[in-house]
């Protein structure tokens, strides 16, 4: 996966922008950065696109800025000259693709049919725009195309909204979405940059929700610390007497059902620990680290195949240590 594709995967949503005035480029970039989405696809639908890309790329190096609606080699050349870090086209034009490849600039052409996908694959492309997304069948069509073309990663654009974004992002073959809803023409013309920033923040909330759902976070068990094995056994027997929970002994604890663990010693956490299951523990760890949470890597344990099995957060919550657990 290229650096640009890594950025797409990280950002999840690329604001699609139509600017009528080049002077709006700088305040727009500031609004997007403030909202936590430092990216923009500046469409070549207006005469100021090249200048807008140049302004953003030169003054805001942290922005992942590219050109959209690129219909010709000359437009691609102008965009790259202005500092575009990627090119997006509504359809597949072989000459534009080859020019971008020669220049070493990623291009994501629009493909909505099996024939177009095969042509793109023949050109060495595996990340494609699906445009217009909703009008071309939306997620149902993307799922159908992903069956024979499992290696393709999609960037649906056109009809993507805050309301259907989560559904698109939940599909594993969708690397990111293009969203024009983030940057409304009326807000740009009115200089309503706060509205754009707020839409970015609301989008990030949706992205986080989609990511958390994809990990499938759930409580697997709660562990309670005891001072010794005899005390742990007494607690396990009391749970059996009360509720009929049969205890299963392990070298370090008693499990009263799969959800309650009675430790034979004072283990992690002031009071005990909570195991949070995840479909991909390593990816969940990376996701939480990206949000500022720290893990104690010395507690990490691994499965025989090398995958992360469990690792503890450094922070306690309500006296309990928390660890991720691979489902």
Map each language-model feature to its residues.
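N-terminal beta-strand motif that seeds the catalytic metal site of vicinal oxygen chelate
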Residues: 4-18, 208-236, 269-276
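Glycine-enriched alpha-helix->loop->beta-strand junction motifs that scaffold or abut catalytic
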Residues: 33-38, 59-63, 81-87, 102-108, ...
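Conserved N-terminal beta1-alpha1 strand-loop-helix module at the mouth
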Residues: 1-74, 78-82, 102, 162, ...
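Catalytic cores of alpha/beta
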Residues: 28, 72-82, 115-123, 160-176
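Catalytic beta/alpha-barrel core
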Residues: 16-18, 39-46, 63-71, 84-92, ...
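Glycine-rich phosphate-binding active-site loops on the catalytic face of alpha/beta enzymes
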Residues: 90-96, 129-139, 173-195
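Vicinal oxygen chelate
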Residues: 213-215, 259-264, 289-327
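Core segments of cupin and vicinal oxygen chelate
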Residues: 28-30, 45-47, 217, 223-261, ...
């Amino acid at each position: 996966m290229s650096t640009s594709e890594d950025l797409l995967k990280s950002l999840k949503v690329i604001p699609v922008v139509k600017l009528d005035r080049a002077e709006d480029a700088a305040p727009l970039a500031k609004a997007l950065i403030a909202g936590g989405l430092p990216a923009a696809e500046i469409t070549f639908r207006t005469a100021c696109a090249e200048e807008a890309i140049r302004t953003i790329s030169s003054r805001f190096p942290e922005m992942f800025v590219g050109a959209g609606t690129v219909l010709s080699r000359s437009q691609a050349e102008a965009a790259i000259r202005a500092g575009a870090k990627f090119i997006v086209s509504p359809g597949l034009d072989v000459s534009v693709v080859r020019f971008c490849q020669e220049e070493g600039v990623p291009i994501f052409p629009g493909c909505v049919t099996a024939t177009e996908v095969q042509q793109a694959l023949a050109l060495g492309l595996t990340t494609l725009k699906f445009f217009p997304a909703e009008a071309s069948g939306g997620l149902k069509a993307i799922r159908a195309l992903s069956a024979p073309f499992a290696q393709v990663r999609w960037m649906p654009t056109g009809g993507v909204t805050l309301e259907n974004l989560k559904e698109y992002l939940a599909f594993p073959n969708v690397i990111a979405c293009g969203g024009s809803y983030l940057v409304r023409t009326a807000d740009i013309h009115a200089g309503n940059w706060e509205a754009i920033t707020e839409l970015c923040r609301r989008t990030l909330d949706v992205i986080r929700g989609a990511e958390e759902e994809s990990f499938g976070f759930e409580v697997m068990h709660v562990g309670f610390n005891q001072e010794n094995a005899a005390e742990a056994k007494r607690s396990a027997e009391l749970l059996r007497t009360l509720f009929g929970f049969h205890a299963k002994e392990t070298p370090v604890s008693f499990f009263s059902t799969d959800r309650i663990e009675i430790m034979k010693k004072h283990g992690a956490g002031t009071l005990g620990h909570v195991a949070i299951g995840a479909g991909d523990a390593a990816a969940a760890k990376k996701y939480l680290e990206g949000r500022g949470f720290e893990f104690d890597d010395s507690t990490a344990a691994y499965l025989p195949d090398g995958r992360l099995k469990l690792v503890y957060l450094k922070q306690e919550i309500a006296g309990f240590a928390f660890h991720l657990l691979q489902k």
